[in-house]
Regions:
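N-terminal glycine-rich FAD/FM-binding segment characteristic of electron-transfer flavoproteins
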Residues: 1-226
């Protein structure tokens, strides 16, 4: 049984928190507003969140950035951190180990910072709307990102997709991935790639790589081709 659930939204514009104000089961919504969230400095994110968030167990969605922030936040608060959780039963948290070949269950006594993998829990519906509290926070920014280069794509990220169609080196050439993209567009899937395909063809970006050295996925349907 859970206690009061507070949703904390890190943002540069407090209106970004309005979309979660009516989530079912939410007791309170806090928009933590800071310019630090416009950048990618995990230390700054953790500093700003720590200054504004109430005490208690904190849940993050498990992404590369949020897991970094989660670790730093836990260190600042002197509490446990558990990453990539796929099941929660009271104080017992289960997460995969050895590249998904086994699961471990740890028991947490007291508060913790927990990152939860995407698509392992059902989404919540809408309930009564909550007021959004706005907290201005400052972060201790130690690094500055000069440039972010991102591959332009309107496609789903493989780590968040319910359906993935993934190609390997047997596709023959990166041009043949267009066939996978056509299928993906039809069924609403993300397009992934094996490590061999990513290593062989520079046209296939690492952001598409699925597996131990790529992205961890949890789809309802996975189609491997080539």
């Amino acid at each position: 049984e859970t206690g009061d659930v507070t949703v904390v939204v890190p943002c540069t514009d407090a209106s970004m928190a309005d979309s979660v104000a009516s989530y079912d089961g939410v007791s309170k919504v806090i928009a933590v507003k800071s310019d630090v969230f416009a950048g990618n400095d995990s230390s700054g994110w953790a500093s700003a969140l720590d200054s504004a968030m109430p005490a208690g167990t904190v849940l993050f969605l498990a992404t590369a950035r949020s897991k970094d922030v989660a670790s730093r936040l836990a260190a600042r608060r002197g509490i446990s951190v558990v990453q990539d959780v796929v099941s929660i039963d009271g104080n017992n948290l289960t997460s995969p180990i050895y590249s998904g070949k086994a699961n471990q269950t740890v028991t947490v006594n007291g508060e913790a910072v927990v990152s939860v993998r995407a698509n392992v829990f059902s989404s919540v519906g809408s309930g009564s709307s909550n007021d959004v509290s706005v907290v201005d926070a400052s972060g201790d920014v130690k690094t500055a990102v000069q440039q972010v280069m991102e591959r332009a794509s309107a496609r789903l990220d493989v780590s968040e997709a319910n359906i993935i169609i993934s190609g390997g080196r047997g596709m023959g050439s990166p041009a043949n991935f267009s066939h996978l993209e056509a299928v993906a567009d039809t069924i609403g899937a993300a397009v992934g790639a094996s490590r061999a395909a990513v290593d062989t063809w520079e046209e296939i970006p690492h952001s598409m790589q699925v597996g131990q050295t790529g992205k961890t996925v949890n789809p309802n349907l996975y189609i491997a081709v080539g």
